[in-house]
């Protein structure tokens, strides 16, 4: 009976039987250990026998995996399974990623082999920087306090990013979540608990937004620290904003605080506070547990204003408002990367706004710089499509200022910055677009005044090694220049502390300005009043500039009422465009009626 | 019944001639298999001539073989005849044994696989056409019959037909049977049937199916009416029907207790009396003994204060003394050591802390503190917090054990011998003086094992620690000298779990070798070996009164063993995967078990019935624990979730529905008993522990 030969079996492809080693594999393995020729019947017998033994070993290895509190089978489990069967375990198969083999195919066969790297002994002996693995550490934190999970970084956030996305898409789910036990263990407002006892649930009641006393105190401390004068405290506050879970309930007020702050301080030309507010935006973007898509209609206009606004500071020739524009451009690029979808077309709309400012020949030079900076951060294709064709016209704009024919020193500085920005972002793209022989004459014919300097930059890029090409889209936003710019602005600018006191103004024309500010934002916490200079010339400047401020206030009020982010961005941009014409009134026939209102007010004021 | 009576009468009447006739048929069979030397030896031993041998015909051999397979008593007689032959020739006996073993699966030479398949098909049609109230119970019959037919086809060498048979009919089974079927399908040769443990188990122990009387009569009528000899043969040999009165069970009730490798638990398995009450007399002795001693010894001015403190303590305890629990075992049922004075003081301290315990309920949820182990390179394999919540012991995959102090008190070492000799042994604070204050450390490492440490267990006296490992040893460590004092070697395979008894002195271990063993700390030999599981014993737990031990196994059963007799007194089936964790309730009557199938089942130990199944976890339940007052059940697992269950409501609902024992809960509503679910961020749970004041401590491993 035992000597009876078993019948040859076909390879089974059933799911229940699992996989089995084929006879072909047995032949390959036999060849690898020196067996010249293995018959088909012997290969089949061996394949079946080995398959059964392997399955038993894997089943035992699963037991060791379960008892080690793991869910991944590792090489060590197989070793212990062999050890239980009194078989010598395999040595040299320790791998961190659980797959110690590499795959290769050649000669019509598929092979898996063990990767065996050659190690240079010289390198091992020369470098003594082998790190000792970290020692065991035991950390403890409060997991649950009387049935409520505290929102410490060790605990999961009470409302994950996916839940916040679901809330924004379908608000009706909130009514069901109020009765769900899963949400009951998380720190929430008392409104949801009260709703359990109410038989009739109104949708309107869910719109109320309650903050606990601790959250209100946290909000107050964070906002005061972020815009205060204490720099270390601001760093801690931004760190908390960027990493703490559980801030989603304060997020609407945070975004409103940033949006209103930008509106007020851009009128007041307060560069330092604008920089602080942009750093708050960056901290909120870095927080992994916050879902910001619902608040883009407030954040994007604020960031866009900091990029393309005509004037961001009191002294354009002294303060470094260019650093703020660069920082805000990188923020806008990150926002487009995070939130751009096929439905909202965020990047397309942002690109259109920047290119519209670039197309306009009467754009202020500061706004022109902001548009170029914004477009350059959005990627190489954007530079190729929108900036390169306009290089000739930009050269014609900045040539008079750089050659010294312009009287204004501010415009000269702006032209220099525009040239530096173009020389930084355009050469890598031009290197790919144009062929190898670069001549100054060709570049001058194509790009005008900036041609020779661009030609030198392109030649330099071609001669440099490939590894040193500057990456245009850098993920890390550098905050060092923005911090130093903020300190400079704080030192130079004569800004008083935040106060609600109204100081006396010598000029009669200043009184309507102050009254207009207070009428539009009566509840605003930070109202900054600029002291007037006793010089008569400065008084003339203040008196002459009162009309643009009124226009900007009207534009800001108009933008606040608009719920569409595109319309808001257009409003801000148009407000900036209007300021480029000092005292000249320009009427565009095809504009919207709101813009006509602004134009009419500007005409009456002048 | 009448057939059985006639068989017995016929057998008794022809005892002598039947015995000789069986011998002649055996000789004929041996001759048929060409075993000449064995034949000659057996003829000489039995004084049988060749003339008598020729009188036996082929049909007589078949009849005797059929009788041997059917009757169990004939096996003993045949073995008796075999014993002289075994001493003479080993290889011939081995082949003969193999042939006879395989003959168990072969009824005749002309084996017909188609005949079996047809019989199974008719049985399946019968089950599908039966009434709805009986269909689910009758469908429990399909799996064991399918497996036995598969064995028969495989034993005859028709492997391809066997695989086709399984492929065709496996869709009838429930999901949890497919995994067990996969193990059986690893068999591909007839010889492997003799070595597989599951096959041997299904042959020796019958597959148990609980069925109502009506369903059973329907099934019997089907077998008899349609002359299903094949199915009737399998049923009589391999199935056992545990019938009960009342209505048939529905789908949920059938699935609740099915899934084990040996079917369901018999009623007989849970018949024995279990004393699940707690040992209360021990506490009173500890309290009454030290009461007069300090009063007599004290001559200090503080003497008047001590009697005042003692008197309020005595009154509530003395009132409890009058009560006697009928379910509690007597104090001397198993021998327990005398408590030392220091241990009595520890118990007094524990009782005082228990009086300050927070009463947990649905409105008063517990607070939890989470201990996260960072930078563990080979993973935390176990974690254990001492009963007084002062120390945490973790076992790792790199064979080391590490102990952390969870209080500001440091882990100190015993002083050296010279310093100890100078100490005053009679002083009150001898336990504090003998420790070296300069040697305090926050954490200590214990090295000695050569494999991953799968369990650590603190002694109730807080001076000893047990650990078990993959290297098949159990080590006892001293928490005073921080060294290994005993190595217990009894298991030859990896030891999965080890637990100290709540009263100390005894501990129990379980292993890959399918046994659990009871040890005493002062002996190298196991006192009891609990044998009965069909696969690995994965977890073990002592009853609060130290008289019983519960074990969970990879054969998906939970058993309760009596430490005094070593017998299995409860067998509970219902899990669909390996049992991974066990916990006794504070009162001792209920047992909670968690499994790899993500479920938690509550059992009533008074009769072994299933109370309820808790469905919430999405991965292995690695740890279960009850609160000190027994009102909250906390469970956690590898899905990074901690769930709190209202155990008070579970027991209330169970006692109020206790009238019908044979029927379980009709509906498994998931959220009836669930109080709260707390997810952790990135840490699967390794251990849960309630302190004496009902603060929950969680230990997890940070998964980077």
UniProtKB/Swiss-Prot annotation, chain A:
GO MF term list: protein heterodimerization activity; RNA polymerase II general transcription initiation factor activity; transcription coactivator activity
Q: Which PANTHER family match?
A: TRANSCRIPTION INITIATION FACTOR TFIID SUBUNIT 6
Q: Which UniProt keywords apply?
A: Nucleus, Phosphoprotein, Transcription, Transcription regulation
UniProt family annotation = Belongs to the TAF6 family.
Its job: TFIID is a multimeric protein complex that plays a central role in mediating promoter responses to various activators and repressors.
The record's listing under SMART domains reads: TAF
One of the Pfam families matching this protein, by short name:
TAF6_C
**A Gene Ontology BP annotation from the UniProt entry:** transcription by RNA polymerase II
Q: Name one GO cellular component term.
A: nucleus
What subcellular locations does the record give? Nucleus
In terms of InterPro entries, this protein maps to: ARM-type_fold (IPR016024), Histone-fold (IPR009072), TAF6 (IPR037796), TAF6_C (IPR011442), TAF6_C_sf (IPR046344), TAF_TATA-bd_Histone-like_dom (IPR004823)
User: What residues bear Phosphoserine in this entry?
Assistant: 546-547, 550
Name this protein carries in UniProt: Transcription initiation factor TFIID subunit 6
Q: How does it assemble?
A: Belongs to the TFIID complex which is composed of TATA binding protein (Tbp) and a number of TBP-associated factors (TAFs). Taf9 and Taf6 exist as a heterotetramer. Interacts with Taf1.
From Swiss-Prot, chain B:
Question: Which InterPro entries does UniProt cross-reference here?
Answer: G-protein_beta_WD-40_rep, TFIID_NTD2, TFIID_NTD2_sf, WD40/YVTN_repeat-like_dom_sf, WD40_repeat_CS, WD40_repeat_dom_sf, WD40_rpt
Please give the CDD domains that the UniProt record associates with this protein. TAF5_NTD2, WD40
Localization, per the record, is: Nucleus
As for what it does, the entry says:
TFIID is a multimeric protein complex that plays a central role in mediating promoter responses to various activators and repressors. May play a role in helping to anchor Taf4 within the TFIID complex. May be involved in transducing signals from various transcriptional regulators to the RNA polymerase II transcription machinery.
* Keyword field: Nucleus, Repeat, Transcription, Transcription regulation, WD repeat
- Give any Pfam family that matches: Beta-prop_WDR75_1st
Q: A GO CC term?
A: nucleus
Naturally occurring in which organism (per UniProt):
Drosophila melanogaster
Compositionally biased tracts (Basic and acidic residues): 314-324
**A single GO BP annotation from the record?**
transcription initiation at RNA polymerase II promoter
Q: Which family does it belong to?
A: Belongs to the WD repeat TAF5 family.
This chain's protein is named Transcription initiation factor TFIID subunit 5
- Identify the stretches annotated as WD repeats: 376-405, 448-478, 490-520, 532-562, 574-604, 616-646
Q: Where is this region: Disordered?
A: 287-336
Q: Which domain of life is it from?
A: Eukaryota
Q: How does it assemble?
A: Belongs to the TFIID complex which is composed of TATA binding protein (Tbp) and a number of TBP-associated factors (Tafs). Interacts with Tbp and Taf4.
On whether Transcription is a keyword of this UniProt record, the answer is yes
């Amino acid at each position: 009976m035992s000597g009876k030969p078993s019948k040859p079996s076909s390879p089974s492809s059933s799911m229940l039987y699992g996989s089995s080693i084929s006879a072909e594999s047995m032949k390959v393995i036999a060849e690898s250990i020196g067996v010249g020729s293995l018959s088909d019947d012997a290969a089949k017998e061996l394949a079946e026998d080995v398959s059964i033994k392997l399955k038993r070993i894997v089943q035992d290895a699963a037991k060791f995996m379960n008892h080690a509190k793991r869910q991944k089978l590792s090489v060590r489990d197989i070793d212990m399974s062999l050890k239980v069967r009194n078989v010598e375990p395999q040595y040299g198969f320790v791998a961190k990623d659980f797959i110690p083999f590499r795959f290769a195919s050649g000669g019509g066969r598929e092979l898996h082999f063990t990767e065996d790297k050659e190690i240079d002994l010289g390198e091992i002996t020369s470098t003594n920087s082998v790190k000792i693995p970290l020692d065991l550490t035991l950390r403890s934190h409060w997991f649950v306090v009387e049935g409520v999970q505290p929102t410490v970084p060790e605990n999961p956030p009470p409302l994950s990013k996916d839940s916040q996305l679901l809330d924004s898409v379908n608000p009706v789910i909130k009514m069901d979540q109020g009765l769900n036990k899963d949400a009951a263990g998380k720190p929430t407002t008392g409104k949801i608990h009260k709703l359990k006892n109410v038989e009739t649930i109104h949708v309107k009641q869910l719109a109320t937004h309650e903050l606990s006393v601790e959250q209100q105190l946290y909000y107050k401390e964070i906002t005061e620290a972020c815009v205060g004068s204490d720099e270390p405290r601001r760093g801690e506050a931004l760190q908390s904003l960027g990493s703490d879970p559980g801030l989603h309930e304060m997020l609407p007020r945070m975004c409103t605080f940033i949006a209103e702050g930008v509106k007020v301080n851009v009128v007041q030309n307060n560069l330092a506070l604008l920089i602080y507010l942009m750093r708050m935006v960056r901290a909120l973007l870095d927080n992994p547990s916050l879902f910001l898509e619902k608040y883009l209609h407030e954040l994007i206009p604020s960031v866009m204003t900091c990029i393309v606004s005509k004037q961001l500071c009191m002294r354009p020739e002294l303060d470094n408002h260019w650093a703020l524009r660069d920082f805000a451009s990188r923020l806008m690029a990150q926002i487009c990367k995070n939130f751009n979808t096929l439905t909202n077309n965020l990047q397309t709309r942002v690109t259109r706004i920047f290119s519209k400012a670039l197309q306009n020949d009467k754009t202020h030079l500061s706004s022109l710089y902001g548009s170029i900076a914004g477009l350059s951060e959005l990627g190489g294709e954007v530079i190729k499509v929108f900036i390169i064709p306009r290089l000739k016209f930009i050269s014609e704009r900045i040539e008079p200022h750089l050659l010294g024919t312009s009287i204004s020193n501010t415009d000269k500085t702006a032209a220099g910055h525009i040239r530096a920005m173009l020389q930084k972002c355009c050469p890598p793209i031009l290197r790919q677009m144009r062929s190898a022989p670069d001549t100054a004459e060709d570049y001058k014919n194509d790009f005008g005044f900036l041609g020779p300097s661009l030609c030198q930059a392109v030649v330099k890029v071609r001669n440099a090694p490939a590894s040193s090409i500057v990456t245009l889209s850098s993920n890390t936003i550098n905050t060092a220049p923005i911090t130093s710019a903020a300190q400079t602005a704080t030192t130079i600018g004569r800004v008083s502390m935040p106060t609600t006191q109204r100081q006396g103004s010598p000029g009669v024309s200043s009184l309507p300005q102050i009254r207009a500010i207070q009428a539009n934002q009566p509840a605003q916490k930070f109202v900054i009043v600029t002291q007037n200079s006793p010089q008569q010339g400065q008084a003339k400047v203040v008196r002459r500039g009162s009309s643009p401020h009124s226009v900007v206030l009207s534009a800001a009020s108009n933008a606040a009422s608009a719920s569409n982010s595109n319309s808001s961005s257009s409003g801000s941009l148009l407000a900036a465009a209007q300021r480029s014409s000092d005292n000249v009134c320009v009427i565009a026939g095809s504009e919207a009626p709101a813009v006509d209102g602004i134009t009419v007010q500007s005409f009456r004021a002048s | 019944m009448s057939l059985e009576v006639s068989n017995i009468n016929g057998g008794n009447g022809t005892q002598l001639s039947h015995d000789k006739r069986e011998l002649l048929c055996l000789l004929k069979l041996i001759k048929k298999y060409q075993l000449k030397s064995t034949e000659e030896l057996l003829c000489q031993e039995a004084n049988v001539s060749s003339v008598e041998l020729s009188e036996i015909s082929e049909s007589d051999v078949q009849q005797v073989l059929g009788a041997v397979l059917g009757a169990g008593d004939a096996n003993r007689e045949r073995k008796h005849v075999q014993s002289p032959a075994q001493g003479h020739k080993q290889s011939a006996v081995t082949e003969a044994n193999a042939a006879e073993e395989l003959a168990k699966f072969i009824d005749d030479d002309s084996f017909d696989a188609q005949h079996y398949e047809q019989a199974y098909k008719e049985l399946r049609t019968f089950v599908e056409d039966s009434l709805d109230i009986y269909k689910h119970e009758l469908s429990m019959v399909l799996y064991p019959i399918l497996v036995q037919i598969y064995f028969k086809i495989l034993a005859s060498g028709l492997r391809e037909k066997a695989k086709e048979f399984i492929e065709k009919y496996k869709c009838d089974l429930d999901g949890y049977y497919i995994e067990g079927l996969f193990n059986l399908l690893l068999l591909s040769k007839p010889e492997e049937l003799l070595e597989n443990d599951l096959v041997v188990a299904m042959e020796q122990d019958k597959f148990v199916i609980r069925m109502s009387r009506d369903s059973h009569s329907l099934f019997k009528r089907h077998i008899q009416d349609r002359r299903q000899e094949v199915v009737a043969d399998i049923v009589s040999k391999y199935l056992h029907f545990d019938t009960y009165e009342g209505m048939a069970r529905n789908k949920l009730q059938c699935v609740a207790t099915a899934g084990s490798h040996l079917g369901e638990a018999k009623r007989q398995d849970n018949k024995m009396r279990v004393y699940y009450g707690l040992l209360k007399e021990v506490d009173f002795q500890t309290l009454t003994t030290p009461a007069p001693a300090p009063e007599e010894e004290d001559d200090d001015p503080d003497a008047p204060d001590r009697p005042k403190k003692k008197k309020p303590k005595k009154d509530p305890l003395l009132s409890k003394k009058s009560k006697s629990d009928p379910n509690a075992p007597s104090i001397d049922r198993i021998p327990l050591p005398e408590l030392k004075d220091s241990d009595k003081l520890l118990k007094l301290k524990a009782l005082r802390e228990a009086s300050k315990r927070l009463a947990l309920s649905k409105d008063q949820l517990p607070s939890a503190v989470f201990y996260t182990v960072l930078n563990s390179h080979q993973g935390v394999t176990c974690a254990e917090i001492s009963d007084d919540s002062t120390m945490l012991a973790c076992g790792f995959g790199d064979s080391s054990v590490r102990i952390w102090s969870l209080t500001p008190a440091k882990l100190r070492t015993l002083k050296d011998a010279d310093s100890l000799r100078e100490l005053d042994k009679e002083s009150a604070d001898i336990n504090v003086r003998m420790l070296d204050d300069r040697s305090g450390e926050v954490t200590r490492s214990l090295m000695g094992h050569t494999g991953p440490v799968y369990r650590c267990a603190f002694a109730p006296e807080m001076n000893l620690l047990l650990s078990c490992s993959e290297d098949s040893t159990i080590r006892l460590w001293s928490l005073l000298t921080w060294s290994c004092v005993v190595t217990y070697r009894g298991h030859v395979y990896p030891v999965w779990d080890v637990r100290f008894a709540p009263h100390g002195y005894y501990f129990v271990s379980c292993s890959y070798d399918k046994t659990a063993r009871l040890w005493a700390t002062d002996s190298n030999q196991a006192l009891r070996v609990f044998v009965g599981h069909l696969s690995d014993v994965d977890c073990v737990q002592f009853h609060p009164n130290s008289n019983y031990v519960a074990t969970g196994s990879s054969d998906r059963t939970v058993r309760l063993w009596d430490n005094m007799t070593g017998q299995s007194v409860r067998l509970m089936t219902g899990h669909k995967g390996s049992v991974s964790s066990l916990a006794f309730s504070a009162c001792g009557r209920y047992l909670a078990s968690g499994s790899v199938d993500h479920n938690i089942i509550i059992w009533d130990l008074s009769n072994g019935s299933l109370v309820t199944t808790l469905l919430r976890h999405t991965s292995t339940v690695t740890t279960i624990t009850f609160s000190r007052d027994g009102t909250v059940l906390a469970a956690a697992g590898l899905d990074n979730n901690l769930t709190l269950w209202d155990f008070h409501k579970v027991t209330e609902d169970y006692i109020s529905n206790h009238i019908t024992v044979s029927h379980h809960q009709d509906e498994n509503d998931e959220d009836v008993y669930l109080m709260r679910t707390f997810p952790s961020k990135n840490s699967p749970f390794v251990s849960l522990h309630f302190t004496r004041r009902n603060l929950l401590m969680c230990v997890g491993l940070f998964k980077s």
